[in-house]
Amino acid sequence: MIHEYDIVVVGAGPIGGYLSGKLSQSNHRVLLIEEHKEIGRPFQCAGLVNPGAMAKVGLYDTALTRIWGARMYSPSGIKIEIGNPDITRTWSVCRKIFDERVVMNSVANGTDIWLSSQPKSAVINDDYVEMVIDSDGTERIVRTKLLCGADGAHSWVRRNFKMGRPKEMMIGLQIEVTGYDTEDGKLDLFTGENVAPGFFSWAIPSGETTRIGIWSKPNLLGEKS
């Protein structure tokens, strides 16, 4: 059996979920596929949603903390505080619930979704792209007029069509903790070779917990990772 769609979106994160929903609203037949068995897992980012993006999806009830400012620490320990309590800079959200809601809205608009599914091949023909998708252990053939890759930094779509790779790769490490001394509405940013060689580290209040992480180049972290 061949499954035919106007558009296939690979990756059911917030971008893939939002894109597929908007396309379905425009009366396109859309298939959204996700390699994991559930939406929002694994959690792979700091969980910040800027005001413009939040306004588009309207999922304010998924927010854990409203961020309006920051405490920034220089390599020498000097602290600079910025922000205005009256101006929201970003929202710290529960990514699992946020992602699920974005995808649920897409499905409500008519999107089909296959979980535990990942593409095995995609060949461009004159009028369509023919894909073989492993869907929970069963191979399915899909034909689509448009294939969209929303599958992240290690995109299968990018690799399959040899669309190049980023000139520079960085790595992020993060842990969620309790007991960190935060200031209401402010996140912390740290710079310096001792704490974040090559870039910066952060501490983001997220309701009753704090997400502490670092962004750097793998070769610079060494034993620090």
PLM segments and residue spans:
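Glycine-rich FAD pyrophosphate-binding loop
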Residues: 8, 21-43
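Short beta-strand/turn micro-motifs composed of small residues
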Residues: 11, 34, 74, 216
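A conserved beta-strand/loop capping segment in the N-terminal third of enzymes
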Residues: 50-103
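Short, hinge-like loop/turn segments at secondary-structure boundaries
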Residues: 47-51, 166
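N-terminal Rossmann-fold NAD(P) dinucleotide-binding loop
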Residues: 16-17
